[in-house]
Amino acid sequence: MRSESEVSISTVFLGEYVGDDEKSLGILMGGSTSCMVGMNSAFVNDTIRLDLPTPSSPQITTRIVSLVIVLFNTLVFRSPLFLFSIFICLIYKFHSCFEGKPLYQMLKI
């Protein structure tokens, strides 16, 4: 298992597990609550596993939702800097909507 001091990176892996014929999508969630997951079948229980649709009936929604979960986990929960940058962008957007007047003048009573 990874120590809590290591950098947490979420990864999307698309492929086949050892000893398994069907293709599956394993989402490796980063963080101190999970461990690094390899191709070994002993670690399959540590992944969130979603079966991929067959080519005759593609379900793009399942793939998109799983990617959104990974991105949301990586960006929001693991990076306070990301939240801070969104906050700064919102303040800048609010500031620019009022013809460049400083924010403190807009809030004066």
UniProtKB/Swiss-Prot annotation:
Keywords: Membrane, Transmembrane, Transmembrane helix
Superkingdom of origin: Eukaryota
GO cellular component, one term: membrane
Cellular compartment(s): Membrane
Spans through the membrane: 24-44, 68-88
Membrane topology field: Multi-pass membrane protein
Note: Partially overlaps GEM1.
Name of the molecule in the record: Putative uncharacterized membrane protein YAL047W-A
Organism (species): Saccharomyces cerevisiae (strain ATCC 204508 / S288c) (Baker's yeast)
